[in-house]
From Swiss-Prot:
Listed SUPFAM superfamilies: alpha/beta-Hydrolases
Keyword Nucleus attached: no
Protein name: Carboxylesterase 1D
GO cellular component: cytosol; endoplasmic reticulum; endoplasmic reticulum lumen; lipid droplet
Swiss-Prot/TrEMBL keywords: Cytoplasm, Disulfide bond, Endoplasmic reticulum, Glycoprotein, Hydrolase, Lipid degradation, Lipid droplet, Lipid metabolism, Microsome, Serine esterase, Signal
Entry similarity comment: Belongs to the type-B carboxylesterase/lipase family.
Function: Major lipase in white adipose tissue. Involved in the metabolism of xenobiotics and of natural substrates. Hydrolyzes triacylglycerols and monoacylglycerols, with a preference for monoacylglycerols. The susceptibility of the substrate increases with decreasing acyl chain length of the fatty acid moiety. Catalyzes the synthesis of fatty acid ethyl esters. Hydrolyzes retinyl esters.
Cross-referenced InterPro entries: AB_hydrolase_fold, CarbesteraseB, Carboxylesterase_B_AS, Carboxylesterase_B_CS, Type-B_Carboxylest/Lipase
Main location, first listed in the record: endoplasmic reticulum
Transmembrane feature ranges: none
Catalytic reaction equation(s): a carboxylic ester + H2O = an alcohol + a carboxylate + H(+); a long-chain fatty acyl ethyl ester + H2O = a long-chain fatty acid + ethanol + H(+); all-trans-retinyl hexadecanoate + H2O = all-trans-retinol + hexadecanoate + H(+)
Keyword GTP-binding: no
Superkingdom per UniProt: Eukaryota
Length: 565
């Protein structure tokens, strides 16, 4: 056959279908990793995918309730082609959230483990060249208690926008946020994991075709909250250059606390540990198996509305703590002092954040579609752990939101608006204003669209529910079947906005509706079937809540309780 035909054959093998002839192998600081090439329909250049790349040592044994340590080096080529286990969590809750939020066609089989500090990488770069593509690091949501990286497939965003997408995991629940409020277990382990993942990106992403000098962190819900915490944290300074918080910011009262003792005591007691001292609790909890801690976790009834107990003694979240390390002070103090990373920042909310998914998961009794004033008042008080509204202010709040109508269906809708404003809308505007006032480029959006991929159980009237923008951000119409042209175009536009922002710190670009910067005029973008600029998002609501919180503070005895908004 001669030599030349053989060379031509091997070249043909390289270039047919755009696949290189052998799977990608990349050097990391700790050792080589083997990935796989995946093609997206309509693209000749495949995306190299690496799944389950370790960014820290497994946080087991004495490393439980301890800062993450660097991974041990390896001398072989590590196979990183299968999904890593998600961090320990309630398997049912994790499964439900993953199925509701995934942009994939098929649900991936879920596994859970305390050994979970892994990330996934999607890179469209030609790995033989020294590409320096923008990097987008995704932090998943799930109330800091459930969720995982692999629910979100970065393939479409990576291929369409020529960016490196990294999805990271971090410890959750007891494992991620158990705190005694002192040196024995400071807490915020999950946030320290996020910082460790960003450090790993700085040290390694160049070999995957990414630019460590252009890293955007983005996340949704507790992921958006985490992004907002990292913007405020001195530990994350210079580890990223732009940030996007979708439906969650550092002033989300439910997810942050100064008062950790009662939660620590509850976790210890439910685990059969003595609570005599912090050291005793931590030592005992470190001896528990993963399954035993999971049992404790299930008893905590995390992310559930407690309709029976005293709202002031109900702890449906294992929150971030003001620990003096990740957060030197309370977020509102850091914001007021303007002592944070003034990177370009996109902050957004969805039109109906409390539309269906959150009330359903938390067990709010709203299914019959009606709500009277008395029940609304009771639900608001039962929601104290989430809203932090003092009991004597509840009638004022209920009257303001629900008082204008006798229609019980309308009252239910207004109650959902109230919940959305307190948890998402008002904190998002306050954070955006603080960011703007510190001199950082800031952009706001409100997302209003009903994806075709959502659960059939969801009422038709819910448009722009919590999490709905994820389908657009991660290009679901290019991975799942059945999207209309309108939905496909919406996803193209949103991916373009997000990636332009990752590239330039500004979402605007050719062929896109103009997105005004959030300045003193408070222009923002309404994103949906028709996308257009508007002004002063939640302006009246922010004023109402600011007045209410001021009254609350004035009435409170001198013992200061941590208050948001």
């Amino acid at each position: 056959m001669g030599l030349y035909p053989l060379i031509w054959l091997s070249l043909a093998a390289c270039t047919a279908w755009g696949y290189p002839s052998s799977p990608p192998v990349v050097n990391t600081v700790k050792g080589k990793v083997l990935g796989k090439y995946v093609n997206l329909e309509g693209f000749t250049q495949p995306v190299a995918v690496f799944l389950g790349v370790p960014f820290a040592k497994p946080p087991l044994g004495s490393l439980r309730f301890a800062p993450p340590q660097p991974a041990e080096p390896w001398s072989f080529v590590k196979n990183t082609t299968s999904y890593p286990p998600m961090c320990s969590q309630d398997a049912v809750g994790g499964q439900v959230l993953s199925e509701l939020f995934t942009n994939r066609k098929e649900n991936i089989p879920l596994q859970f483990s305390e050994d979970c500090l892994y990330l996934n990488i999607y890179t469209p770069a030609d790995l033989t060249k020294n590409s320096r593509l923008p990097v987008m690091v995704w932090i998943h949501g799930g109330g800091l208690v459930v969720g995982g990286a692999s629910t979100y497939d970065g393939l479409a965003l990576s291929a369409h926008e020529n960016v490196v997408v990294v999805t990271i995991q971090y410890r959750l629940g007891i494992w991620g946020f158990f705190s005694t409020g002192d040196e024995h277990s400071r807490g915020n382990w999950g946030h320290l994991d996020q910082v460790a993942a960003l450090r790993w990106v700085q040290d390694n992403i160049a070999n995957f075709g990414g630019n460590p000098g252009s890293v955007t962190i983005f996340g949704e819900s507790a992921g958006g909250f985490s992004v907002s915490v990292l913007v405020l944290s001195p530990l994350a300074k210079n580890l990223f250059h732009r940030a996007i918080s979708e439906s969650g910011v550092s002033l989300t009262a439910a997810l942050i606390t100064t008062d950790v003792k009662p939660i620590a005591g509850l976790v210890a007691t439910l685990s059969g540990c003595k609570t005599t001292t912090s050291a005793v609790m931590v030592h005992c909890l470190r001896q528990k198996t993963e399954d035993e801690l999971l049992e404790t976790s299930l008893k905590l009834n995390l992310f559930k509305l407690d309709l029976l107990g005293n709202p002031k003694e109900s702890y449906p979240f294992l929150p971030t703590v003001i620990d003096g390390v990740v957060l030197p002070k309370a977020p509102e103090e850091i914001l007021a002092e303007k002592s944070f990373s003034t990177v370009p920042y996109i902050v957004g909310i969805n039109k109906q954040e409390f539309g269906w998914i959150i009330p359903t998961l938390m067990g709010y009794p709203l299914a019959e579609g009606k709500l009277d004033q008395k029940t609304a008042n009771s639900l608001l008080w039962k929601s104290y752990p989430t809203l932090k509204i003092s009991e004597n202010m509840i009638p004022v709040v209920a009257e303001k939101y629900l008082g204008g109508t006798d229609d019980l269906t309308k009252k239910k809708d207004l109650f959902q608006d109230l919940m959305a404003d307190v948890v998402f809308g008002v904190p998002s505007v306050i954070v955006s204003r603080s960011h703007r006032d510190a001199g950082a480029s800031t952009y706001m959006y409100e997302f209003e669209y009903r994806p075709s991929f959502v659960s059939a159980m969801r009422p038709k009237a819910v448009i722009g529910d919590h999490g709905d923008e994820i389908f657009s951000v991660f290009g679901s119409p290019f991975l799942k079947d059945g999207a209309s042209e309108e939905e496909t175009n919406l996803s193209k536009m949103v991916m373009k906005f997000w990636a332009n922002f990752a590239r330039n710190g500004n979402p605007n670009g050719g062929g896109l509706p103009h997105w005004p910067e959030y300045d003193q005029k408070e222009g923002y973008l309404k994103i949906g079937a028709s996308t257009q600029a508007a002004q002063r998002l939640k302006d009246k609501e922010v004023s109402f809540w600011a007045e209410l919180r001021a009254k609350e503070s004035a009435q409170r005895p001198s013992h200061r309780e941590h208050v948001e908004l």
